[in-house]
Amino acid sequence: MAVAVSSSWSGSSSLMTPHTITVSGLPVHVYGLPALTVPATSSAGLAVVFVLHGRTESHEHPSIMGIVNRVVESARERRLAPDGKGAKDLLVVTFDQRNHGHRTVDRDRNLGWMEGGRKRAQVRKDKGMQAHELDNVSHATDMLACQVGTSRDVSFLIDFLPPALFPHDERTVTDWYSVGFSLGGHATWLALAHEPRITLGIPIVGSPSTHTLLTNRAANLPAPAGPLPLSAPYFPRTLMSLFDALDPDRTTRDRWTGKKICVLSGADDHLVDYYKGGSDKFVEKLREWGVEVDAWVQPNTGHACTPEMIERICDFIWRRGLSPEKGKL
């Protein structure tokens, strides 16, 4: 595997300027390197948090950059405070998910069964599409495939980012976290469930059950395009078996031991509803299992990551991840 390596230490760079490296053809953007303590004298731990973007977006989308910039800034401020001595350093990592950003192959395969909005309505009109025609027949398969692919990219980068980023063994990564918005929130749930090295996760308007989320969407797709049957070609048997094997809410208790999770949702989110998407029931189950879960459904909020959510993200990462005290919320 070819890994392109450039100098990882750039102390004169802006804290918000990404250091981009290529890991086996995947551009990876790393924020926070200038804030690291001196490698030769540092005994502090080092946490890396992946921030995963939403469907049809990219690593540069404003919703992601708002999270990235504030998380880097907040961690730096808190670590420099009097009570921050001994806290872990933090790096924030972004990359484009499969079929998104620079990895786009077929944009239509990122669409739902029926996309809303005036822009899409005009596209459908220009293409001569009929009211009953779907934008993307394979939406369910494409959604799960992208989510799982992203979670596996996270595992891949946990393996290969350290040698690419620190070729002279300047630092050792001690902790791995994941934060994700929408599609990235689904992928964060999957990373929590299937990657034991991810110990802290914050899914934002994400679902731990793609099966629950998508079957609800299919059943409620308005006529004349819907409702859709829960069978082929929309839900092939092979896809149903993947839901059984992969959906986080179908995994066993041992997968969640020691995990720290903060679930953020909008009360008026009609795309990934906290209840219809299965988050409420799974959060209850996790709490029954003794897993530390902080869940907040923000009133008067739709499918968005708000400034209030971003502050909760920063606070959770600090208190449950970076802080030398690790006090409970």
Predicted features, each with a name:
Residues 1-47, 329:
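A domain-start/cap signature at the N-terminus of enzymes
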Residues 25-110, 274:
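Short, surface-exposed "cap/lid" segments of acyl-processing enzymes
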Residues 38-43, 200, 210-289:
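The feature captures the conserved acid-bearing segment of alpha/beta-hydrolase catalytic domains
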Residues 95, 179, 204-205, 264, ...:
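Alpha/beta-hydrolase-fold catalytic nucleophile elbow
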Residues 108-169:
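Alpha/beta-hydrolase active-site loop
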Residues 155-223:
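Primarily recognizes the serine-hydrolase "nucleophile elbow" in alpha/beta-hydrolase
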Residues 271, 276-329:
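C-terminal catalytic histidine-bearing segment of alpha/beta-hydrolase fold enzymes
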